[in-house]
């Protein structure tokens, strides 16, 4: 192993070369991995009583990283999923270390043997058709906000889109004038796919675009908040919770389920969820 191999050059080459150029990582992935490694380095610096810039690779050994992961769970109250996400970033970095400096393969290999922690399997809740219909019909169709909420809920139910995909749709991602309308969803990790949409959703989207004066070819968001800016994840969650509060009097079973935008992905059947991969986008 290279003696006293400083972390700084390896970290720089990792983000500049491996993630950006080789892996074409998304900004979200870059930010997540950067946060994980920053937290690890600060933990190591505190534990070893050294400045972060003075840390060397061999000090980030298996035992130190296991202690870091334990602290995430025990002191920071991170979930197992978050702990595993941090470990994924660390393992990615050490894969780069092994390739960039073969002399450090041993220390990298020992870190790479740290296993992903298995989480308890939680019960997946599903919505019935009656519950979904009650949620979609809950918003007031006589108000602009109500019409937007209805269309957004209908979009989630008919496409099975992730909330980030639904809020990220622009008018020019829609093809509503085709005999078989469809939408381009921009997924995680640059995985885009084309999803067919039914006629009821196509009509609702057409009406929403017309109400806001948005042309089909414009790269403008179709779902916007009170300030006419793209709907956020928080805003999407608020729409769903507001619909639940209104619909629960009709469908009391809704009160027994943890409902968020994600639950619409478990509304079965969803023949459109897989979609068609669009590698050229």
Swiss-Prot record:
One of its GO terms (molecular function) is DNA binding. The keyword DNA-binding applies. It comes from the Bacteria. This is Putative integrase/recombinase y4rD. The active site is at 162, 188, 262, 265. Residues 122-281 form the Tyr recombinase domain. Belongs to the 'phage' integrase family. InterPro entries: CB, DNA_brk_join_enz, Integrase-like_cat_sf, Integrase_catalytic, Integrase_recombinase_N, Integrase_SAM-like_N, Tyrosine_recombinase_XerCD. Keywords: DNA integration, DNA recombination, DNA-binding, Plasmid, Transposable element, Viral genome integration, Virus entry into host cell. It comes from Sinorhizobium fredii (strain NBRC 101917 / NGR234). GO terms for biological process: DNA integration; DNA recombination; establishment of integrated proviral latency; symbiont entry into host cell; viral genome integration into host DNA. Residues 5-98 form the Core-binding (CB) domain. It holds the Pfam family Phage_int_SAM_1. Seems to be non-functional.
């Amino acid at each position: 192993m290279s003696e006293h191999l400083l972390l700084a050059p390896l970290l720089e080459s990792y983000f500049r070369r491996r993630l950006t150029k080789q892996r074409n990582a998304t900004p979200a992935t870059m930010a997540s991995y950067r946060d994980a490694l920053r937290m690890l380095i600060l933990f190591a610096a505190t534990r070893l009583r050294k400045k972060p810039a003075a840390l060397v690779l061999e000090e980030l050994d298996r035992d130190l990283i296991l202690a870091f992961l334990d602290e995430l769970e025990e002191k920071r109250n991170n979930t197992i999923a978050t702990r595993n996400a941090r470990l994924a970033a660390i393992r990615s970095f050490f894969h780069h270390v092994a390739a960039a400096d073969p002399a450090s393969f041993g220390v990298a290999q020992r870190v790479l043997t740290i296993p992903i922690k298995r989480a308890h399997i939680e019960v997946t809740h599903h919505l019935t058709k009656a519950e979904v219909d009650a949620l979609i019909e809950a918003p007031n169709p006589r108000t602009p906000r109500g019409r937007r909420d209805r269309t957004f809920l209908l979009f989630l139910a008919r496409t099975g889109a992730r909330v980030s995909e639904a809020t990220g749709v622009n008018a020019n991602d829609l093809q509503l004038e085709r005999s078989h309308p469809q939408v381009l969803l921009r997924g995680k990790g640059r995985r885009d796919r084309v999803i067919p949409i039914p006629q009821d959703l196509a009509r609702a989207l057409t009406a929403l675009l017309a109400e806001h004066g948005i042309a089909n070819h414009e790269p403008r968001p179709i779902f916007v908040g009170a300030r006419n800016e793209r709907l956020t994840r928080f805003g999407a969650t608020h729409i769903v919770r507001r619909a639940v509060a209104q619909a629960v009097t009709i469908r009391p079973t809704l009160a027994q389920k943890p409902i968020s935008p994600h639950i619409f992905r478990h509304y079965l059947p969803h023949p459109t969820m897989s979609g068609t991969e669009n590698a050229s986008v």
